[in-house]
């Protein structure tokens, strides 16, 4: 089933809202389970100052999104662009089944693509 980290972070994340004054937003969906996630980023001097999200997601996506958010606030966007699946595994302290890998990185992927949109670099990351 789910470890304690996933169970805790899947309940009522306080960063579930549409930020009013954001610099970039981005939407992604997981085509395996149809989770939908939209992130809102406030970026100043290439530092993530705030991150919020709205979603229609399962427990894994919600929990990984919230724990991911906690870890990237005040990080440089270039550093955030280097993070991938292994980073999520470190955060949740557990491997994720193949069936749930896309769910575990949906917030990360959506954030990376929001940053690419912010940078206007033409890059689109995929699962």
Segments (PLM) and residue ranges:
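Short, conserved micro-motifs enriched in small and acidic residues
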Residues: 55-63, 98-105
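Short connector loops at helix/strand junctions that flank enzyme active sites
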Residues: 21, 34-36, 48, 63
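Short beta-strand elements
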Residues: 30, 35-45
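Alpha-helical support elements that line or immediately flank enzyme active sites
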Residues: 60-78
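N-terminal cap/leader regions of alpha/beta-hydrolase-fold enzymes
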Residues: 12, 44, 61-65, 81
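C-terminal binding/interaction regions
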Residues: 1-20, 24-26, 49, 75-127
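A short interface-forming secondary-structure element
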Residues: 42, 46, 51-60
